[in-house]
C-alpha cells in the first residue's frame, strides 16, 4: 500500500527519525542539569554560578523562537533542517573543546539558536510526513522522543559525564546528531514551507483568551518546576548528603516516571484533560513542599521523584495538546510562542534556583518553587472553570 508516492514504511521512518531528532534536541537542553557539579569543578566555579548557563540557554530560545520562525517561514524545510543541524553539531564540538566557561556559554547559545528553529517547525513537519490518517500518532511519537530525553537522555548523559567527563557527553550528543542528520538527508523529500503563519497570525492568537490563559499557566508552572529541578543534582549531593551515583539513579527514576505520566494522559487525556492537569499541578505543589523533608533518606526521595515525574509529564502533555487544539490555523506560530514561553519558565526557574542557592540556601529550592506552583494551581482552577469544555471535545 502506498501513500501519495511513498510507502507507509518510509513515511513512518521519516517520522521516527524526526522523533529521534526531538530526543537529541531535548537531551542537550536537559543534560546540563545532571552535569552542573562536574562542569563547576572543571572550571573552579560554584555549582550555582554554572547554573546560570541554564537560564541563558532557555531565554535565548524564548527570545529567538518567534523571530527565527518568521525569518525562515519561506525557506524549504529540508534545507532548513540541514542548516540547523550543522549549527547544532558545530556548537557541540565547541562545547567539547571549551577552554573556559565563556566559550561553553557561547557554544550553548549556538545550540539554543538551532533549538529555537527546530521546535517551531517540528509539530507541523510531523503532521506533513505522517501516513494518511495517522497525524495524531505522529505527534505522539514526537512527544515520546521528548519524554525519552528525560527518561534516558539525561541519565545516560550524566553517566557518560561521570565516567568519561562532561565534555564527552556533549561530543556524543553531537555525533548522535550527525548520524540523525545523515538519515534525514537520505529520507526526507523537499518540503516547501506550508501554513507556517506570519506576523498577521499573532493578533488572531492574542485575541483568544483561552490560549493566552494557557500560556500564562505554562510559564508559571514551568518556573515552579525548574526552580527545584534545575538544582536537583547538587541538592541530592550537598543538601541530602547522598552519593553522586544516587543522584544519577534519582534522575532516572524521575524521568522514568514520565512514561507513567504519558500513559495516564494517553488513557484519560481526551476526556479529562483539564482535570488531569489540575490534579498534576496539585501533585507538583505537594512534591515541592516535601522535597526537603524527603531528603532524609534515599527511599523517600525516590518515592517523591516518581510522583514528581508523573506530574510534570501530564502537565507538559496537557499544555501542548491544548495549545495545538486552540490554534490549528497557525500551528507553527502557536508552537513557536509555546516553546518561547516554556523556555521563559525554564530560564526563570533556573534563575530563581540560582539566586536562592547563592544568597539563601539550596535546601529552600523546593519551598520557593512551591510558591509559583500554588499560584499555577489557583490559575488552572479559574481558567478551567471559565472554559469548562475540554479542548479535545470542541468541534474542529
Swiss-Prot record:
Residues 36-49, 102, 157-168, 230-245, 296-300, 354-363 are periplasmic. Keywords: Cell inner membrane, Cell membrane, Membrane, Sugar transport, Transmembrane, Transmembrane helix, Transport. Residues 1-14, 71-80, 124-135, 190-208, 267-274, 322-332, 385-396 are cytoplasmic. It is found in: Cell inner membrane. The chain crosses the membrane at residues 15-35, 50-70, 81-101, 103-123, 136-156, 169-189, 209-229, 246-266, 275-295, 301-321, 333-353, 364-384. Its main location: membrane. SUPFAM superfamilies: MFS general substrate transporter (SSF103473). One of its GO terms (cellular component) is plasma membrane. It comes from the Bacteria. GO terms for molecular function: carbohydrate transmembrane transporter activity. It is a multi-pass membrane protein. Belongs to the major facilitator superfamily. SotB (TC 2.A.1.2) family. Involved in the efflux of sugars. The physiological role may be the reduction of the intracellular concentration of toxic sugars or sugar metabolites. This is Probable sugar efflux transporter. It comes from Salmonella typhi.
Amino acid at each position: 500500500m502506498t501513500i501519495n508516492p511513498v510507502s507507509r514504511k518510509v513515511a513512518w521512518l521519516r517520522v521516527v527519525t524526526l522523533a529521534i531528532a526531538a530526543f537529541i534536541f531535548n537531551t542537550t537542553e536537559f543534560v546540563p542539569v545532571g552535569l552542573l557539579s562536574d562542569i563547576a569543578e572543571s572550571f573552579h566555579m560554584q555549582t550555582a554560578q554554572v547554573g546560570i548557563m541554564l537560564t541563558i540557554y532557555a531565554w535565548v530560545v524564548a527570545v529567538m523562537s518567534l523571530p527565527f520562525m518568521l525569518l525562515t517561514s519561506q525557506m524549504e524545510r529540508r534545507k532548513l533542517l540541514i542548516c540547523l543541524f550543522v549549527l547544532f553539531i558545530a556548537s557541540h564540538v565547541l562545547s567539547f573543546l571549551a577552554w573556559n566557561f565563556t566559550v561553553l556559554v557561547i557554544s550553548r547559545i549556538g545550540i539554543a539558536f538551532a533549538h529555537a528553529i527546530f521546535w517551531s517547525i517540528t509539530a507541523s513537519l510531523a503532521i506533513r510526513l505522517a501516513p494518511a490518517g495517522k497525524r495524531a500518532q505522529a505527534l505522539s511519537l514526537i512527544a515520546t522522543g521528548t519524554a525519552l530525553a528525560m527518561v534516558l537522555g539525561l541519565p545516560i548523559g550524566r553517566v557518560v559525564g561521570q565516567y568519561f567527563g562532561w565534555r564527552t557527553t556533549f561530543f556524543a550528543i553531537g555525533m548522535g546528531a550527525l548520524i540523525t542528520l545523515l538519515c534525514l538527508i537520505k529520507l526526507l523529500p523537499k518540503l516547501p514551507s506550508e501554513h507556517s503563519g506570519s506576523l498577521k497570525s499573532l493578533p488572531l492568537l492574542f485575541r483568544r483568551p483561552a490560549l493566552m490563559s494557557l500560556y500564562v499557566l505554562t510559564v508559571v508552572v514551568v518556573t515552579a518546576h525548574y526552580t527545584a529541578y534545575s538544582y536537583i543534582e547538587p541538592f541530592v549531593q550537598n543538601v541530602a548528603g547522598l552519593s553522586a551515583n544516587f543522584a544519577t539513579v534519582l534522575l532516572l527514576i524521575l524521568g522514568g516516571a514520565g512514561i507513567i505520566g504519558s500513559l495516564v494522559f494517553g488513557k484519560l487525556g481526551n476526556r479529562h484533560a483539564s482535570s488531569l492537569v489540575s490534579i498534576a499541578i496539585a501533585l507538583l505543589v505537594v512534591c515541592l513542599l516535601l522535597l526537603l523533608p524527603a531528603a532524609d533518606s534515599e527511599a523517600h526521595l525516590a518515592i517523591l521523584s516518581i510522583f514528581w515525574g508523573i506530574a510534570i509529564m501530564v502537565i507538559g502533555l496537557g499544555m501542548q495538546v491544548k495549545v495545538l487544539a486552540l490554534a490549528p490555523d497557525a500551528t507553527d506560530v502557536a508552537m513557536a510562542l509555546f516553546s518561547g514561553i516554556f523556555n521563559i519558565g525554564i530560564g526563570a526557574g533556573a534563575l530563581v534556583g540560582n539566586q536562592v542557592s547563592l544568597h539563601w540556601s539550596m535546601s529552600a529550592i523546593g519551598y520557593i518553587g512551591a510558591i509559583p506552583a500554588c499560584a499555577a494551581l489557583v490559575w488552572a482552577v479559574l481558567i478551567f472553570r471559565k472554559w469548562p469544555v475540554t479542548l479535545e471535545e470542541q468541534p474542529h
